[in-house]
Each structure stands twice: as C-alpha cells, then as structure tokens.
Regions:
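Non-catalytic macromolecular-recognition regions in eukaryotic signaling proteins
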Residues: 20-183
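C-terminal motif of bacterial Sec signal peptides marking the signal peptidase cleavage site
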Residues: 16-18
Length: 183
C-alpha cells in the first residue's frame, strides 16, 4: 500500500509540475524595461567590427545577425534554464543615438544583459557618445550579451529615431542561412 501511495503522489507531482512551465524571465531575473548606456562604460575599442557582426542602420554592429555566417555560441547562464552569449556590442566612436530593444512578443524568452548598462533589460538607449580620443580606433565596444530560454533565432529591434529595423539574431542556434555556433 505504501508503494502505491508513493507512486500516486509522484505521478501527481509530475503532472502538476508539467503544467507550471518555465518561468517568465521577469520571475527569474531582475529585469528593467529600458536603461541608458553610460558612455564611460566602454570596455574596448576596435579598428572595425569583425565579419561576425552586421552593421545596422550605420549606428550599431550586432553580433550573430542573420546576415552573418554563423550563430553566436551560448553557455549555461543559471544552472539549466537559460543560455547566454558573451559578445560585445560595437558602436561607432562618436556615433549617433539609437535604441536596441527586445520585442514584447519574445520578452518571456529573451533579454539583454549589460552592454554598457549593468544588469538585465529589454531595451538599451545609446545616447550617441561624443567622439573620444581616449580610444585608439573608430569603434567602441560595450561588454555584455543576450540571454535566451533555449537556443534559437530571435528578433531585436534597432531604431535610430527616423528608421526602425527588426534584425534576426542566432543565439545558440542558427537563423536560416547561418552555420550553427562553434562547439
């Protein structure tokens, strides 16, 4: 009788846990809606973005965009539920202001971490920092990346105030036409 009760209890627990699903990103991480990038938080500079980046609207080079040849590699972010990339966001030294955001329809499974702001967010506002002679090259890099519930091709939106573009990005999984990320 004891074994039957234990099996029944286990079956009920499994059934109930299957209904709960994976929590929304807001339930796991302290995510802000929109954060301004601090110009002083530049981590590096480069002569030009690598071929792994796609230049969007002339204001930002995005890693792993569908127009690049390979998706970004991810690593486990929290012991099992989320995967993260570690890739710089590259902007022109002295470039124009822009907004990079996660569309609302994917905010349950995608968010931005850091990229010049610290913490987690769904939108970053880059103010168009003044050109700094402190940086040797023409492009500045903000450290950070993207975090997804599971590897997939996800959308980001880039807006420069006059135009808005939806960009598909391979995060741990390729977008159509891309190679898978490196192992």
């Amino acid at each position: 009788m004891g074994r039957a009760i234990r099996l029944l209890t286990l079956a009920i627990i499994l059934l109930l846990s299957a209904c709960t699903g994976i929590p929304h990103a807001r339930e796991v991480f302290d995510i802000e809606d929109s954060v301004a990038v601090e110009c002083s938080s530049v981590d590096d500079w480069v002569e030009e973005p690598s071929p792994a980046y796609a230049l969007i609207l002339g204001v930002v080079a995005v890693p792993g965009a569908e127009s690049t040849s390979q998706a970004m590699q991810t690593a486990n972010a929290d012991g099992g539920l989320w995967e993260s990339t570690k890739s710089g966001l590259i902007v022109p030294n002295g470039g124009k202001p822009f907004i990079l955001s996660v569309p609302q329809d994917v905010q349950d499974r995608l968010y931005i971490w850091d990229w010049g702001t610290g913490g987690f967010k769904y939108e970053i506002r880059v103010p168009g920092c003044e050109r700094s002679e402190d940086y040797v090259d023409d492009w500045v890099v903000f450290a950070g990346g993207l975090t997804v519930r599971e590897p997939e091709c996800v959308p980001l939106v880039v807006s420069d105030g006059s135009e808005e573009v939806r960009v598909m990005v391979g995060v741990g999984a390729p977008c159509p036409g891309q190679e898978p990320p490196p192992e």
